[in-house]
Amino acid sequence: MALEISRLFPQNIQELPSLSGVRIATAEAGIKYKDRTDLLFIVFDKSASVAGVFTRSKCPSAPVEHCRISLPHGVARGVVVNSGNANAFTGRKGKQTVDTIICAAANALKVKKNEIFIASTGVIGEPMEASSIVNLLPSMAKTAKEGNWLEAAKAIMTTDTFPKLATRRFDCGGETITINGIAKGAGMIAPDMATMLSFVVSDAAISSQMLQSMLSEAVQESFNSITVDSDTSTSDTLMMFATGKESFPCITSKTDPRYEVFSKQLRALLHELALQVVCDGEGARHLIEVHVIGATTDNTAKIIALSIANSPLVKTAIAGEDANWGRVVMAVGKAGVEVDRDLLTIWFGEHRLAINGERDPEYCEEKIGAYMQNKHITIRVDIGLGTGKATVWSCDLTKEYVMINGDYRS
C-alpha cells in the first residue's frame, strides 16, 4: 500500500557525512516488500565499542534476545537489519534464523559471532526464512562503502513515509567529532524505549561502559518521551557504536570533561530523531507537545503528560482541530497520581483555557480555533502542587491511522 508522505515531513533531509571505517550496504531481499531495499549491513573495519537500549516488552523478538546476550562483550564489527518481518513470536525457528544470519555475517567479515548484532522490524508472528538474507551478506560485505546513510535509513523503513536521519559535528576536547544517526518508526511507538529501530555511530573513542551510560541517560529525554499510539513494540532497538579516532584519547570516566560535551550532543541528536518519528506517526497531521508543570515530582509529571499524550480522545480532538480541553482534564484525572481538580490550569499554546478548576473567564472560541489549525500544537498543564515537570511529544489520531493498520498485512 502506497502511503502519502506525512504533512509533517521535514523540509530538508540531512546529508550525513562519511565516517572513516564505517561501511554500509543495502539490498533487496524480498522479505515483504517488492522493488525496494529491505536489508541493511553496517560494517566496522575495526572493532567498535557498543551500547544498546531495548524494548521492555515481555514478548521480545529473537534479534533483541541475541543483542542482549552479545552486548556485554562490548565489541561490534557488524550490524544486520531487515524490514518487513520482525522475527518476533517465532519460537525456536526464529532463534535458529538469527543464529544462521549471525554466522553468515561473521563468516563474511571473518569476525566472532558475538561481534555481530541484528535487528528486525515488520510483521509479528510470521516465520522468517534466513536464506534470502544469508545469500546476500557475502557480496554486501564486499561492496559496502563509506557514506550511504540515506540508503541505510530507507532500507529499514516499514510504514514510514520518509527516512529519518540526523548528524552532529562538534569540538570535543580540541578534536572534531561526528555523530550520525538513523531511525525508523511510525506506529507501535510508546516509551520504554521506544522507537522501533535506531542506530547511532560516532568516530569518538569511548569505552563501552561510558557509551552505555551516555545512551541510557540520553534516551530518557528523547525516545522515552515520545508516543504515537501507546503500543510498545516487541522489537524496539536503539544501538550506538563508537569507532575511535586514533587522535582522540578514549573517554573512560564520567569525570572526563569530554563526557558531558559528547553527551549533550548525543541528547540533541536523539531528540531530533525522536521528533522525526513522531512527525511520521501513522496518519499524523499534527505534532503534539505536552508540558506538565507543578506536579509533586518529575516522575508524576511524566505520568500525567503521557496520560494526556496517549489519550485517544485528546488525540482525535487535535486531529479535528477542536480545542476540547475537557478531554485534557479527563486525561489528568485518570493518570492515577496526586492532582487537585481545583488547582488545574490549562493552556493550548498561549491561550489559557481553564484556571483553578473551571473555564477561564476570558476564554475565546474564535482565537483558540485559529490556533488549532497549526501543525504544531502545545498543551501546557499546571498541576499546582509542586515543582515536578515533564515534556512528552505525540501526534494526533486520524482516520488514516486506522486505514494503515487495518490494511497492514494486505
From Swiss-Prot:
It is found in: Cytoplasm. Gene3D superfamilies: ArgJ beta chain, C-terminal domain, L-amino peptidase D-ALA esterase/amidase. Pathway: Amino-acid biosynthesis; L-arginine biosynthesis; L-ornithine and N-acetyl-L-glutamate from L-glutamate and N(2)-acetyl-L-ornithine (cyclic): step 1/1; Amino-acid biosynthesis; L-arginine biosynthesis; N(2)-acetyl-L-ornithine from L-glutamate: step 1/4. It catalyses: N(2)-acetyl-L-ornithine + L-glutamate = N-acetyl-L-glutamate + L-ornithine; L-glutamate + acetyl-CoA = N-acetyl-L-glutamate + CoA + H(+). Keywords: Acyltransferase, Amino-acid biosynthesis, Arginine biosynthesis, Autocatalytic cleavage, Cytoplasm, Multifunctional enzyme, Transferase. The record marks T121, G122 as: Involved in the stabilization of negative charge on the oxyanion by the formation of the oxyanion hole. It is an enzyme of class 2 (transferase). Pfam families: ArgJ. Substrate binds at T158, K184, T195, E282, N405, S410. The keyword Cytoplasm applies. Transmembrane segments: none annotated. Its EC number is 2.3.1.35, 2.3.1.1. GO terms for cellular component: cytoplasm. Heterotetramer of two alpha and two beta chains. Belongs to the ArgJ family. Catalyzes two activities which are involved in the cyclic version of arginine biosynthesis: the synthesis of N-acetylglutamate from glutamate and acetyl-CoA as the acetyl donor, and of ornithine by transacetylation between N(2)-acetylornithine and glutamate. This is Arginine biosynthesis bifunctional protein ArgJ. It comes from Bartonella henselae (strain ATCC 49882 / DSM 28221 / CCUG 30454 / Houston 1). The gene is argJ.
